[in-house]
Amino acid sequence: MAKPFLKWAGGKTQLLEEILSRPPESYSRYIEPMVGGGAVFFSLASRNNPPESVINDLNAELINAYRQIKANPNLVIEELQALAQNSETYYHIRDAERSPEFLTWELHKKAARTIYLNKLGFNGLYRVNSSGFFNVPFGKRSGIDFNSTNILAASEALQSCEIMNVSYVDILQHILPGDWVYLDPPYLPINETSNFTQYTAGGFDITDHRALRQFCDTITERGAKFTLSNAHSNQIIELYSNYNISVVFAKRSINKNGARRGAIPEVIIRNF
């Protein structure tokens, strides 16, 4: 069974059972406009008779990794195995994108870089600065297993999947009646210390969440089903008050303060 090949902020591994125990009675395709680490997608894709799928993310680096694992998994694995696991190599690889030569890198090498930085970076964070450059420090780890077996399994799971790199709004034109759309946006922060939205150089604020609610309304009008995950907050509850809301608990592992990692309430919102 394929699993996410990256550790991703907001990843849904801890919520898989809650999400997948609440599917539509029937659906024709599975669409994920904000795929991130892809825990839900990989779980569905690894089942018998997996649904036709479309995954998308605005993060071009992430989508390149998906596309290269789909098309060239062995080349990605070879690149990963050739990289030393130490701070000197880490910072050399991390800062390579600041050089004009980075534009000449082959796409599978860039994909390996993404995975390498994710596995060896501090706490598995993906964070960029205002210029769009990855700026996570070395995590002081070695002996990391890049799990080539899982990369190959992920490649197999992706073979029948369409992979896109556009704004989630642009996915709307591809959504048809009978589709099941799973939305996992950057969560609305529930306090001043929990605002982590740097998946790309831009953030995701309350205005974006209101626009996402309108997106969900359009999905509903189109005759498709949606499931959405978000933080348990009064703003989110009010925003989606006309939909089916379930409160669940998830254990979060990406937090700079280890003492704050643990089970926290979240919501699963559905139009069915």
PLM regions: where:
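Short His-Asn-centered micro-motif
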Residues: P33, N56, M164-V166, L183, ...
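SAM cofactor-binding core of SAM-dependent methyltransferases
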Residues: S21, S26-E101
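Conserved acidic-Pro-Pro-aromatic motif
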Residues: G178-I268
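Short, well-ordered beta-strand micro-motif
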Residues: Y116, I268-N271
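SAM-dependent nucleic-acid methyltransferase catalytic core
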Residues: M1-L15, E25, K70-F196, A211, ...
